[in-house]
Regions:
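Outer-membrane beta-barrel translocator/receptor signature
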Residues: 103, 115, 126-135, 140-222, ...
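Structural signature of Gram-negative outer-membrane beta-barrels, strongest in the C-terminal barrel
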Residues: 227-229, 412-414, 420, 424-428, ...
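Gram-negative outer-membrane beta-barrel transporters
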Residues: 26, 417, 421, 426, ...
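Transmembrane beta-strands of outer-membrane beta-barrel pores
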Residues: 155, 168-172, 198-202, 242-246, ...
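Acidic, small-polar-rich N-terminal luminal/periplasmic segments of exported/outer-membrane proteins
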Residues: 28-161, 705
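Periplasmic-side early beta-strands and strand-to-turn transitions of outer-membrane beta-barrels
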Residues: 160-161, 169, 181-280, 286, ...
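Membrane-embedded beta-barrel scaffold of Gram-negative outer-membrane proteins
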Residues: 356, 360, 366-372, 377-382, ...
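C-terminal beta-signal and adjacent terminal beta-strands/loops
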Residues: 442-445, 726, 770, 834, ...
Length: 930
């Protein structure tokens, strides 16, 4: 594939001269207007920049109605998005933890921003001059977290004369958006630009059975830009914004659930999820055939309180058997709807500032100082069980508080026409706090109320009047401990104690911090040997230091029965008239009897009767499902590490004529190591105590051959590139096999070497004076190169309770999140009248299927998707009045951004994140002044 792609570029180079010399009359007198970019810290055009870069200008953003991340990535080759991050050529963030970093750097007016989606959602991309997307490692000039590329958002600045704009949008689902701009001079040396936006839309996911709608918009933002030119040699640009968002966050889409004949249905008749091994003659038995070996085994639903199951009841129990769609694997009947208990709230309060001051020290030397500041709080309360049933209500609450500041000094030196040098120093500091809670405020009160240990705490005559629990205090002292809260554990240690209840019903909490500092120094110079050949060399040294704290609290169930079987258990059971035969009364069932949650029946198939009905909303002694006895636990871990690297760039340019550029580039990239904060198993014991698991830096070697040409006398533009990446220490979060424990653990780790190769092609053709056509295509192939073993526990056709754990070796498989094929085409046709203009636009995008997890399986692949948009624009010739009528996703395609699969713990639930379905509306703009 790689050699074939090189051949394509070589063919294009060989034929470019013929195209350039061709005097073909295609009926067009227009010429392609170059977009000026600052990809290499100095102004140049896309065609003159030896980087794979796509620049989306203001006109394209407005004409195509690009207003969010989902629409934006459709127009960029080899680019997709995750929940909070962007992937370029598959490089992104494979796991979301507080101690990790993104793989694509986000810049706002040339200054680093911590969160990609802050920039991609501000103002609905209104008042943006252009967006530059740089593909491939940008480790020399951009540095921090740009191992996959960089995205730079350039906003509009103050104008020399007074101008203004009002813009309003009305659309389906009561979408209402208002925008305003006022810009002009304050004095001869100072100018301003004030931009305001207010966006509001009701939830597009229709609440089912009278429940609230989800996925709405309620967003306001105000920004002020100031430009100051104190003299001819200096300029300062400052932009400050304040933003607030409070909305109903989108709910997950439940696509399927269940196993066996119940696959594609929602089980509301079982109190606890899980499968137990049984014989073929057991009531309710279902036969499974191992797809690998052909072995047949039988399973049946677990018996609540008898067989080990997840600690929370089935959230759909005694509720509605709701699925979005018909449960099929084609998802054709899925639509925008949700079923929740009504709390899907998201809040976002953000302030940012970017300041650039430049001073010309001479004709050939300019110094720049760049200051960046960001501060935001992000909160959400999310019902993630996709049901409104009253027995169990699973939810998550998050508060994330982020502060960051950056300083950069750049020196731009041009001592001669043949040589230029950009160098600088960089400092970045970030403090992140994340408060995270998993909760279930119903669940019959099992989490909100303090546990009643009943017979475990009752004085027993056989034991001389002491309690059964106290017989184990010497060997398990924490059994007597008080309720352990989130800040109880010592640093590097743990605490455990009785369950005292949590007012919110929290089963897990963490309060984590990550303080990050990066310092860097860089330089990149270009030497022109002659009019055709130029060499660029760049180097960057960077050091990252992370200091982390993870403070956890959790609910867990522990079974004491195995510790007292025999000499203590039998007489104890006899005292209370409890049978002890383990074939009749399992350890879990016995524990529930001792907890006062059940009574023994003597029936081997149904050995206990719950004290409270399973449908009871409240219960003083609820049936325990996992270990039988509830306790509280907590840990506190701290650590600090430093990573550093030297990265570089070597680039050779060949410019055979003014319209052609061929470049060969070798670049290295680096992403710092980090920690798996918030990942339950990501802990390690050391002589200094418990510490969070860390992972090493990720490095990449990137080689790219590019070709850019303007042909047909300025009416056709082609940009292409063929590339390969070689990763070392590829970062991911996987279930890996730990030989020392003979078990699988989910931890963040470096999975070794991986390769990623592909090619891209972008083109613009001014076909006639009225017709413009654009297209891009990308092809990507990826492969794990080292042995990485993963556990599969979420395949409903092969339950691990029946067939045991199955290990997969990822070696030779594809990396996740990367479509092999991606294609977009768009065009417009213009009718010019004396005072007005009418433009018809159409856009089509295709993204091929790709892996949603590290395992290559059909049932959780992200399906291929297509989208077609149409719009009609009426405007005056001076563009002072404008109306755009649009229909997005014309054919109402069902498209997904993500697919997630659960294990037996969630009854193999399959969920998806649905992209926008059909939308329509009108967008009106009025300009004044100038």
């Amino acid at each position: 594939m790689f050699r074939a792609a090189i051949g394509i570029v070589a063919f294009a180079c060989a034929t470019s001269s013929q195209f350039a010399l061709a005097d073909e009359d295609n009926g067009s007198s227009r010429r392609i207007e170059e977009v000026v970019v600052t990809a290499e810290k100095v102004e140049s055009t896309v065609s003159d920049t030896s980087i794979s870069i796509t620049a989306i200008g203001e006109e394209m953003l407005e004409d195509l109605g690009i207003q969010n991340a989902n629409e934006f990535v459709n127009y960029i080759p080899a680019t997709t998005r995750d929940a909070y991050d962007i992937r370029i050529r598959g490089v992104g963030r494979n796991f979301r933890s507080l101690g990790g970093d993104p793989g694509v750097a986000t810049y706002y007016n040339g200054i680093y921003s911590e969160d990609a989606l802050i920039a991609l959602t501000e103002n609905g991309l209104f008042d943006v001059e252009r967006i530059e997307v740089l593909r491939g490692p940008q480790g020399t000039l951009y540095g921090r977290n740009s191992i996959g590329g960089a995205i730079n958002y350039i906003t509009k600045g103050p104008t020399d004369t007074f101008t203004g704009m009002f813009r309003g949008q009305l659309g389906s689902r009561y979408n209402q958006e208002g925008y305003m701009v006022l810009s002009g001079p304050i004095s001869d040396t100072v100018g301003y630009r004030l931009t305001m936006s207010d966006r509001d839309r009701e939830g597009v996911q229709r609440g089912q059975y009278g429940t609230p709608d989800a996925n709405g918009t309620n967003d306001t933002n105000t920004s002020l830009a100031i430009r100051w030119n104190p003299n001819d040699r200096s300029e300062m640009n400052l932009r400050i914004n304040k933003r607030n968002s409070s909305r109903d966050i989108g709910a997950g889409t439940i696509l399927s659930e269940g196993w066996g004949d119940f696959r594609g249905t929602r089980r509301t008749d079982v109190f606890a999820f899980g499968i137990r091994p049984v014989t073929a003659t057991t009531a309710g038995a279902y036969g499974f055939t191992d797809p690998d070996t052909g072995v047949v085994a039988y399973g049946a639903p677990v018996r609540p309180g008898v067989d080990i199951a997840p600690q929370s009841p089935n959230p759909g129990f005694a509720g509605r058997g709701y699925l979005n769609g018909n449960g099929d694997s084609d998802f054709d009947d899925v639509t925008e709807e949700a079923l929740t208990n009504g709390y899907n709230d998201e809040g976002f309060d953000q302030m940012g500032a970017q300041m650039t001051f430049s001073y010309d020290l001479g004709e050939d030397l300019t110094v720049k100082y760049l200051l960046g500041y960001g501060d935001f709080q992000y909160t959400y309360h999310f019902d993630y069980d996709q049901t409104d049933a009253p027995i169990s209500d699973l939810g998550v609450s998050v508060l994330e508080d982020v502060w960051n500041v950056s300083h950069e000094v750049q020196f731009l030196w041009n001592p001669s026409p043949d040589f230029s040098l950009t160098s600088g120093l960089y400092y970045f500091q970030s403090d992140r706090l994340q408060d995270y809670r998993l909760r279930n405020a119903t669940a019959q009160g099992r989490y909100t109320n303090a546990a009643d240990y009943a017979l475990w705490d009752a004085p027993n005559p056989y034991l001389g009047g002491i309690t059964a629990m106290s017989t184990l205090y010497a060997s398990i002292p924490w059994l007597a401990g008080p309720h352990c809260e989130i800040d109880t554990a010592p640093v590097g240690g743990a605490c455990a104690g009785r369950w005292g209840g949590d007012p919110e019903g929290a089963t897990y909490k963490h309060n984590n911090t990550n303080d990050t500092t990066q310092t860097a120094a860089f330089a990149q110079g270009t030497y022109n040997f002659n009019d055709q050949w130029a060499l660029t060399l760049g180097v960057r040294w960077a050091e990252d230091r992370k200091s982390v704290l993870e403070n956890r609290f959790y609910y867990f169930e522990f079974n004491l029965v195995p510790y007292i079987r025999g000499t203590v258990l039998d007489p104890l059971a006899a005292t209370y008239g409890i049978l002890t035969d383990p074939s009749t009364l399992t350890d879990l069932a016995f524990a529930n009897v001792m907890m006062g949650a059940a009574t023994a029946t003597g029936d081997a198939e149904s050995p206990i009767t719950p004290t409270c009905a399973l449908t009871a909303v409240e219960c003083a002694n609820p049936l325990r499902l996992n270990g039988g006895m509830p306790f509280s636990g907590g840990t506190k871990a701290v650590d600090e590490k430093t990573w550093s690297a030297v990265t570089g760039r070597i680039n050779l340019d060949w410019t055979p004529n003014d319209d052609t550029l061929v470049y060969l580039s070798t670049t290295t990239g680096y992403r710092a190591g980090g920690y798996g904060l918030g990942i339950l198993e990501a802990r390690v014991e050391t002589p200094q105590g418990t510490k969070p698991v860390s992972y090493d830096e990720e490095e990449v070697l990137h080689i790219e051959l590019g070709y850019k040409a303007t042909l047909l006398d300025g009416q056709l533009q082609l940009n292409s590139a063929v590339y390969t990446y070689q990763y070392d220490g590829y970062q991911d979060s996987v279930d890996i096999y730990d030989p020392s424990q003979d078990a699988f653990r989910e931890i963040p780790t470096n999975t070794g070497s991986a390769v990623n190769s592909g090619f891209e092609l972008e083109g613009t053709w001014l076909a006639t004076d009225n017709l413009t056509l654009n297209a891009n295509y990308s092809y990507t192939q990826t492969e794990y190169q080292d042995d990485v073993y993963l556990l599969e526990d979420d395949n409903p056709e092969r339950p691990i309770q029946l067939f045991g754990e199955k290990r997969f070796n990822l070696k030779g498989g594809a990396l996740k999140g990367i479509p092999t094929n991606k294609f977009t085409a768009w065009g417009n046709y213009v009718w010019d009248f004396e005072t007005t203009r009418l433009t018809l636009l159409a856009a089509y995008s295709y993204t091929g299927e790709y892996n949603g997890s590290a395992l290559e399986r059909d049932f959780d692949k992200i399906p291929e998707r297509t989208r077609t948009d149409l719009s009609l624009i009426w405007e005056t010739q001076d563009r002072r009045r404008r109306a755009r009528f649009f229909v997005d996703n014309v054919f109402d395609e069902v498209n997904f951004r993500g697919i997630g699969s659960g294990s037996h713990l969630t009854n193999y639930k399959l969920t998806g994140t649905l992209l926008d379905m059909r939308r329509f509306g009108v967008d009106v703009t009025v300009n004044f002044g100038g």
